[in-house]
Amino acid sequence: DTVNAIVEIARAFLVPADVSLGVWLFFMFSRMEMLWGRALAIPDMATPNAQFFRWQQLGAYVSFVGGMLFMARRHLAGVLRKACGLSGGTDDSREPISYPLAFWGFVVSIGACLGWYVYHGMRLPTAVAVLGLVFLWFLVYARIVSQGGLYVAVNQWNMPGVIHSLSGGYAFGASGAVIAAMQGTLLFGGRTTLLSSQTMNAFRISSVFGKRARLLLPALIVSVLLALVMMTHQVLRQAYTMGAVNFSDTLQMVMPRGAFSRAQNIILSPGQSVDPHVGALSMGAIGMTVLMLLRGGLYWWPIHPIGFLASTGYHAQRLWLPFFLGWLVKVGIMKLAGGRTLRHARDFFIAIIIAHFSISGLVGILQLLTGGRFPGL
């Protein structure tokens, strides 16, 4: 509706101009690809959720994360030296988590995850591939939300399907297929369950805490534990009072059935469910590599590679126009009115967002207190 459209434009105004332009531009490019697919009668390019776009997005993800790790190689080497007590380590006195704790905690956590996978019947190479794709998505999502300014993103590709197809149908046993399908639904399909972007934003905010920044990690852990207990209680209470069958079809009904259906296809028809698209995968990787090289080599380059990562999916279909309008308003003010007017416009759009979410939050609280009898927005 009109109110939501205005709020989306306000959000897009706050996004860096090169990101908002990239989201709009690459969304239009994806629609051109879809038109080419229809004109050439290629079914895998004919719809927004076609296999071509899924594998192209995966290729872009792999290239983006590879470039990100390459650019951070010196910093990561300094973190490793610091964690191992070697000379030349990077100073972590202003970080919310010490580098030794972060590094060894990461190592122990990865080991525990791999051990859990193997214990429940997943082959070790497959477990490494599953965890690698999970972290690939986490890193991309964190960058899209915290650096790019986008508040949501959707990955099109299916994690167990990718591993199953690239392995020729030999990666998963029965238990491994079920585990991967369930985690693919929970960690890839449910964007609101991901903590990587929220954690990164919290770490950025911690810079204002000074010496107390190290209290952020225990505060985050306590917050997550409390949220898990509260939301688990709330979901179970609603399930037993209203009936779980009355829940939303998409999240509570369709997605669980889809997860078990994917696992069933891998188990019962391993050969028929193998469907790799190496060409689309390569196109996405090459395209993202070129974009990152242009971004790093040309100071004036106006398009951020993050736009390519976030230009497909359900939300992109509804955000492309607000992002274009937000970019147009921002660039127009910068060109015609100057920085002072731009700052005033920024405050105006922030006020719109705060007012919208404050009213929505108040209505939500009143609905909760009245058992849903208070009218919603």
Residue ranges and their predicted role:
Residues 1-377:
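Alpha-helical multipass membrane-protein architecture
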